[in-house]
Amino acid sequence: MLAYMSEQTIALVTGANKGIGYEIAAGLGALGWRIGIGARDRERGAEAVAALSARGVDAFAVPLDVTDDADVSAAARLLEENEGRLDVLVNNAGAAGGWPDEPTSLDPAGLLRLVDTNVVGVIRVTNAMLPLLRRSAHPRIVNQSSHVGSLALQTDPGTDLGGIGGGYAPTKTFLNAVTIQYAAELRGTGILVNNACPGYVATDLNGFSGTRTAEEGARIAIRLATLPDDGPTGGLFDDEGPVPW
């Protein structure tokens, strides 16, 4: 597990006002960390902070729409001014679109919205937070991916991924490639960058049809956020270990 610093570990979790993000925040907060609750909806973000605080978590609100440049810049300034650094970034915020979603009937505008949230949003937030992460003794970046983004699993006739996801699945494949590039560029800096596959979790993204709880889905992101300094980087993981690209 992450070697603890003398100061409290500071983490930011995007999309943390509900679902998997909320449980990631709760799990990391249970370690005694100070958790920034990134949320696009200010009111829901404040409610999540209140609920986590009632559970003993040291949480604070970070208004954050990952698709908005000004919002992301403001979030980085807030962390700079109030915390001075960032130890762990969990890019959890995401959008799903429809499912199943055949590529022959995709709405290009809808696809671009998915890419802006699931891929560009991760890049936007990561780049804004990197100066703060570089000040950490044990920096970690965890990106929320999915089994449906794995090309190996998509092309395996024995793997059931629940149908065709012509919009959502490619954004997670794109995110996987982005994570590999970040890990390659940041190798040797101490910043470990990995992708988490939470499994088929019951959230509002799938109409709560998933077979896993949000708490179960949060486990792998928590594990990757607390990797030791000699842990892996540039990988895709679920609860059972590495997932093929």
Predicted feature residues:
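C-terminal helical subdomain
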Residues: 173-176, 188, 195-196, 203, ...
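A glycine-rich helix->loop->beta "capping" turn
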Residues: 55-57, 78-91, 97-99, 107
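Conserved glycine-rich Rossmann-like NAD(P)H-binding loop of the short-chain dehydrogenase/reductase
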Residues: 31-47
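Catalytic loop of short-chain dehydrogenase/reductase
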Residues: 95-115, 134-187
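Hydrophobic positions on the long internal alpha-helix
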Residues: 90, 125-129, 133, 178-179, ...
